[in-house]
């Protein structure tokens, strides 16, 4: 039986649960449940703190886990990333009081508060910067105001929380994070390979369905070359003749984030009846 870790709370919990449910796996009926057995798919799910998931997977106690890339980097666990899941995006940045043009070199000799001490120490060592890293488990933004730290290193989304505490992010991100599906490093050739690959394929199919749309449209045959350049699809677009020999029907997958621009381009070359449809799953 495969053993899979899922975040038990926080911003990653609900999207992770939804993806697994869409992939055909049993969901928990009570938020207090710490384990759920799915006998149909021969999988047991464990609902754990996101920060602990990489450690459990890296130790070999669990086969897979869903957590943030930033948490994986900080854990130092021997895991590998199988899939990026397309939600929970953020950057891990340094931040310090606003009103000054900070650089990472300014961190030398400072006290840096963070909930990710290993990640910060590794980055500082890479840059040859000596500083004191102070571990806090949350609300690190207030540490500067309270005089506990001179700067912080934390996950930055919109930046609103930093602004509320008169802080500004600076330097290159230590880590660009999002939710990821991880497994223990060095699992090639082990038992349950088929079951493992099936879980990855199912989850990947759901994620792909969230990131792509199916585009159907009618196109003048004279504009076919331009149209297929705009919508090349994954392997190749589907092209079918219409009753009017001067027109063809084209179908292709397109990235959801680009669909409006693509439709504009198609309309500009004379395409008609351009229809974008949601897809739930995709195997490829």
UniProtKB/Swiss-Prot annotation:
Keyword Metal-binding: yes
Subcellular location(s) per record: Cytoplasm
GO cellular component entries: cytoplasm; plasma membrane
Keywords noted in UniProt: Amino-acid biosynthesis, ATP-binding, Cytoplasm, Glycosyltransferase, Histidine biosynthesis, Magnesium, Metal-binding, Nucleotide-binding, Transferase
InterPro entries reported for this sequence: ATP-PRT_HisG_long, ATP_PRibTrfase_cat, ATP_PRibTrfase_CS, ATP_PRibTrfase_HisG, HisG_C, N-reg_PII-like_a/b, N-reg_PII/ATP_PRibTrfase_C
PROSITE patterns from the UniProt entry: ATP_P_PHORIBOSYLTR
Regulation of this protein's activity per its record: Feedback inhibited by histidine. Also inhibited by AMP.
Substrates-to-products reaction catalysed: 1-(5-phospho-beta-D-ribosyl)-ATP + diphosphate = 5-phospho-alpha-D-ribose 1-diphosphate + ATP
Pfam families: HisG (PF01634), HisG_C (PF08029)
SUPFAM superfamilies: GlnB-like, Periplasmic binding protein-like II
UniProt similarity note: Belongs to the ATP phosphoribosyltransferase family. Long subfamily.
PANTHER family on file: ATP PHOSPHORIBOSYLTRANSFERASE, ATP PHOSPHORIBOSYLTRANSFERASE ATP-PRTASE
Protein name, entry field: ATP phosphoribosyltransferase
The organism of origin for this protein: Mycobacterium tuberculosis (strain ATCC 25618 / H37Rv)
């Amino acid at each position: 039986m495969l053993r899979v870790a899922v975040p038990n709370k926080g911003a990653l919990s609900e999207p992770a649960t939804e993806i697994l449910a869409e992939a055909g796996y049993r969901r928990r009926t009570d938020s207090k449940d710490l384990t759920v057995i799915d006998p149909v798919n021969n999988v047991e799910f464990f609902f754990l703190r996101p920060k602990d998931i990489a450690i459990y997977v890296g130790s070999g106690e669990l086969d897979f886990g869903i957590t943030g890339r930033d948490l994986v980097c900080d854990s130092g666990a021997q895991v590998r990333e199988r899939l990026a899941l397309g939600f929970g995006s953020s950057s891990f940045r340094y931040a310090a009081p606003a009103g000054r043009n900070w650089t990472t070199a300014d961190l030398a000799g400072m006290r840096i508060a963070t909930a990710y001490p290993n990640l910060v120490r590794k980055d500082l060592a890479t840059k040859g910067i000596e500083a004191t890293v102070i571990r806090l488990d949350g609300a690190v933004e207030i540490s500067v105001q309270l005089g506990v730290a001179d700067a912080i290193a934390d996950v930055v989304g919109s930046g609103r929380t930093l602004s509320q505490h008169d802080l500004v992010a600076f330097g290159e991100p230590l880590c660009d994070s999002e939710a990821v599906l991880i497994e223990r490093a060095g699992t090639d050739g082990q038992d349950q390979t088929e079951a493992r690959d099936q879980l990855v394929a199912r989850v990947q199919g759901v994620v792909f369905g969230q990131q792509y749309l199916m585009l159907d449209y009618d196109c003048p045959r004279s504009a076919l070359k331009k149209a297929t350049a705009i919508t090349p699809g994954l392997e190749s677009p589907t092209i079918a003749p219409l009753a009017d020999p001067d027109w063809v029907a084209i179908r292709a997958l397109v990235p959801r984030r680009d669909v409006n621009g693509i439709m504009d381009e198609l309309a500009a070359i004379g395409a008609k009846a351009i229809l974008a449809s949601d897809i739930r799953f995709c195997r490829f």
